[in-house]
Amino acid sequence: DLTIKDGEISLLDQTQSSTPTLYNHIDVKLSDFAPNTPFTVDASVHMAGAGEQAITLQGKGGPINSQDASLTPFHGTLQLKNVGVSDFTKFLNSPATAGTDGVLTGETKIDSDGVKVTANGQTNIEKAKVRGMELGFPVSMQYDLTDDVPNGAITVRNLTTKLGSTPINLNGTMQTKSTPAHIDVNLRANNVSVAEAAKYAAAAGIALTPGTTVSGTVNANIHAVGSADKPALSGTLSAANLQASGKDLPQPVQIQSINLNLTPTQIQSNPFTITSGTTTANAQLTMRNYTAPSATVDATLRAPNAQLPAILAMAKAYGVTSLDKVSGQGTLNVDMRASGAVKSLTAAEIEKTLNGTVNVNFNNVKYSGANMSSELSKIAGFLRPGSSQSTSGMTNISKMTGNIAVRDGIAETKDLQATLDIGNVGLVGTANLATEALNMRATAVIAQNVSQQVGGQQIGGFMKTALANNQGELVIPAIISGTFSNPHFQPDVQQLAQMRLKGLVPNLSNPSSLTGVLGGLLGGTKTPGQTTTQQPGQQQKPADAVQQVLGGLFGKKKQTNPPPK
């Protein structure tokens, strides 16, 4: 017999490391231990943390396999009693579970014939934490599985995981010799709490916007076969009474029900609705050849007469941060379709396939990312900025209207007009929804009273970066590049030269002629003799706000754009 009390054991796995691992606070009693004979083991480890924490292994094993100790036959029981995960991690000297904690209790029966190892039992985790985040509910696992070690084949007869009171059942096989592993498994889940699943996902690093809470239930009946990273799926997945709410959401966002039908070649949803307040967005999604290197998506989203606060709420509920600096009122009409091949199912790839239209009619919009009045004053060289041109990074837009056409992920406007406190701004140009690039031209017409306040024809940029029309209104053409969240402004000397050459100087009362001039510079059509006008001065940020609305609807969108040539 061999007895060890409060001892230390050093083990070296030469296939994994050249440094031995030291284990301490160990009690071991071996009976009938001799070469080529079975033996009895009674071993326990006492954790050094708070409370009574013990791991006990009892059973019969041997003879020891001299070639590979892991293939030694063994029949026994492993017990965990109030074992702290963090203390267990320290004992194992392993960083793999850093940030994870909880209290483990359970019992597992182990049977190994030297080739196949079967484990049957249950483990419970109380006060579970993942990445330092308290889950707020217990986690338990019941399992019955066999590992054919030499052949790398795992058979899962039953694996039931409970997040709180909700069970998720899995069974099937896994071939682990290939990379990635090959799986053939069935998964069933009935009335899984979305709130509990979201907490677990958030703790694992997959989260919605901070401060957002979700509720609802999910049912799944799925058969997955193939490579573990891209298995072919069959079955159904459905969710009901989904709702997202939170302190940062203007109003709750709801999906009453959504059903996904899964086949090995296609995933298709039923037509479903997303609602927030009085706004309803109608959507449908189909994904084909999803196991191939290049899948095909076909998705639609239509939201007639949608309220801007509702669209902002929907965007924030789904983790879109590009709209965090935007608030306001008004409506927009959205008719979009994403259709085409994508290399991956990322937002940037899907955005490249977007086509459709957006019509906006906003009011009282605030954008906290920049001050367009300040940017325009720098370009024009205002002598006396005046009280209306705050140095704060806020753009106030009392009115914004226009149409946006999207083709293959490029959003283009020819008539976007915005009313600012200093005058009107008209914008034309494009925004790349995938690369976040802005390629815009803007013309600001400063109201006469404001024009006089800032210096009139005595401004530093007069006849260089700004003109005056016959009504005494300053006109400032500008190029906007950069991104939605960080636009860059510079003088548009080409547009200025065109205005001087053709005598087309916009005014406040004729915004249509303004877009004609801009359209001509960008290769579009213009009406001879028209004078371009802008709606009350705006900052590039208004355009930014519209593009970001698109971003909210179809994923995070920002854009960097090369300056127009």
Roles of regions detected by a PLM:
Residues 1-32, 52, 90-93, 170, ...:
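Secondary-structure transition motifs
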Residues 1-92, 101, 107, 112, ...:
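Elongated, acidic membrane-bridging lipid-handling scaffolds
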Residues 2-9, 23-26, 83, 128, ...:
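Solvent-exposed loop/turn tips at the surfaces of repeat/solenoid architectures
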Residues 4, 23-25, 105, 120, ...:
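Hydrophobic residues on conserved beta-strands that form the core of alpha/beta folds
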Residues 16-28, 48-62, 90-109, 133-144, ...:
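Amphipathic hydrophobic-ligand
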Residues 21, 46, 66-71, 75-76, ...:
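Extended terminal
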Residues 43, 78, 121, 170, ...:
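Membrane-embedded beta-strand positions of outer-membrane beta-barrel proteins
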Residues 128-132, 242-247, 447-456:
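Short aromatic-acidic-glycine turn motif
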